[in-house]
Amino acid sequence: MVLIKVLANLLVLQLSYAQKSSELVVGGDECNINEHRSLVFLYNNSFGCSGTLINQQWVLSAVHCDMENVRIYLGVHNLTLRNNAEIRLPEERFFCLSNKNYTKWDKDIMLIKLDRPVKTSTYIAPLSLPSSPPRVGSVCRIMGWGAITSPNETFPGVTHCANINILPYSVCRAAYKGLPAQSRTLCGGILEGGIGSCMGDSGGPLICNGEMHGIVAWGDDTCAQPHKPVHYTKVYDYTDWIQSIIAGNTAATCPP
């Protein structure tokens, strides 16, 4: 089991070697350039992750994507052209656990306040938080710059998107030993395999009905295997905490 963060130097070096394949995220296709306006790239010259713009000055990501000297790129499609993007720095970061001692199955969430707001544009727009939890069986969208092949990773350089299903949590418990009976995560994937979030997609969104329902957290060492779904932090369970922090209540606590 691995967190789906990526060594970004490797990603950048491999951009020109990406393969054209119908098995492109793994099992996806290149996103429409206007489809991922909320998606952001977190990068510090060593590691890369994704995040999601949820209003003009706040980004939601995974706490395991926290890194020093990070820059936040908005409006990016092709990573080789990221210097044409809007660039922001984190002004403040907020975690559910002050020591960031998260577990694989709980509280892998980070809220970042940008040093200055961004304007909505053709390529940049915030994504709404969920109004209710997604139902099992819902078809949701994943996206990112992560590997499109696994276990020998190939990175595409441009954003890829795919559809997956919200699966019963029992499917994830059957796939990964030691999970608790309940968790503030969503189990997502395709039971037959072939499609799924992969190395480099960490922190990115799981989008259902136009709302941000999940944050890419962790999955199997080899991506998109049958009966090996990915775990996504369940954003709905943290909406009160998120909204309280944004409103200025920095002492707000996460759900237990």
Curated annotation (Swiss-Prot):
Lineage: Eukaryota, Metazoa, Chordata, Craniata, Vertebrata
Name of the protein: Beta-fibrinogenase-like
Family the UniProt entry places it in: Belongs to the peptidase S1 family. Snake venom subfamily.
Any Gene Ontology biological process: proteolysis
Glycosylation sites: N44, N78, N101, N152
Keyword annotations of the record: Disulfide bond, Fibrinogenolytic toxin, Glycoprotein, Hemostasis impairing toxin, Hydrolase, Protease, Secreted, Serine protease, Signal, Toxin, Zymogen
SUPFAM superfamilies linked: Trypsin-like serine proteases (SSF50494)
GO cellular component: extracellular region; secretory granule
Propeptide span(s): 19-24
GO MF term set: serine-type endopeptidase activity; toxin activity
Residues spanning the signal sequence: 1-18
InterPro entries, per the entry: Peptidase_S1_PA, Peptidase_S1_PA_chymotrypsin, Peptidase_S1A, Trypsin_dom, TRYPSIN_SER
PROSITE patterns in alphabetical order: TRYPSIN_DOM, TRYPSIN_SER
Distribution of this protein across tissues and organs: Expressed by the venom gland.
Taxonomic source organism: Daboia siamensis (Eastern Russel's viper)
Ranges annotated as spanning the membrane: none
Disulfide bonds: C31-C161, C49-C65, C96-C254, C140-C208, C172-C187, C198-C223
